Amino acid sequence: MMALLQRVTRARVTVDGATTGEIGTGLLALVCAEQGDTEAEADKLLAKLLKLRVFADEGGRMNRSLQEVGGGLLVVSQFTLAADTSGGNRPSFANAAPADTGRALYEHFVARARAQHGEVATGRFGAMMQVELVNDGPVTIPLRIPPASAA
């Protein structure tokens, strides 16, 4: 399972003109389930995300986690993170989990995030979404927990 994290001062996602999720300072996590992923990969990815030290401490060093700063978490599903661009000019998404598996893992990830962190907002799985953000830094970090079957 993978995520592209962006440290933000604010972010929101809209579907059909209606805001479905919005945060202030925190992390925007674009999340993708891959072929072979299970809840175990989702749990490991979330644990890493919540503890990743990407926020500044008093000295200006990236030394504080999302949990330590009490920031918001905006989780948006994005199967295109699994794109394979090695052949031709059209990306292949064959590495992404099937839609039903992707939805189940996304919902599991969000439920666990809500159980472990205060402020969690979301997009809508499978919808065409508009994501607005102000990237702080900019800080953009890819995270990936490979499926156990690929290890």
Curated annotation (Swiss-Prot):
Q: Which reaction does it catalyse?
A: glycyl-tRNA(Ala) + H2O = tRNA(Ala) + glycine + H(+); a D-aminoacyl-tRNA + H2O = a tRNA + a D-alpha-amino acid + H(+)
Q: What is its EC number?
A: 3.1.1.96
Keywords assigned by UniProt, alphabetized? Cytoplasm, Hydrolase, RNA-binding, tRNA-binding
Instruction: Output the superkingdom of the source species.
Output: Bacteria
Function, in words: An aminoacyl-tRNA editing enzyme that deacylates mischarged D-aminoacyl-tRNAs. Also deacylates mischarged glycyl-tRNA(Ala), protecting cells against glycine mischarging by AlaRS. Acts via tRNA-based rather than protein-based catalysis; rejects L-amino acids rather than detecting D-amino acids in the active site. By recycling D-aminoacyl-tRNA to D-amino acids and free tRNA molecules, this enzyme counteracts the toxicity associated with the formation of D-aminoacyl-tRNA entities in vivo and helps enforce protein L-homochirality.
Q: Please quote what the entry notes about the protein's domains.
A: A Gly-cisPro motif from one monomer fits into the active site of the other monomer to allow specific chiral rejection of L-amino acids.
| Protein name according to UniProt | D-aminoacyl-tRNA deacylase
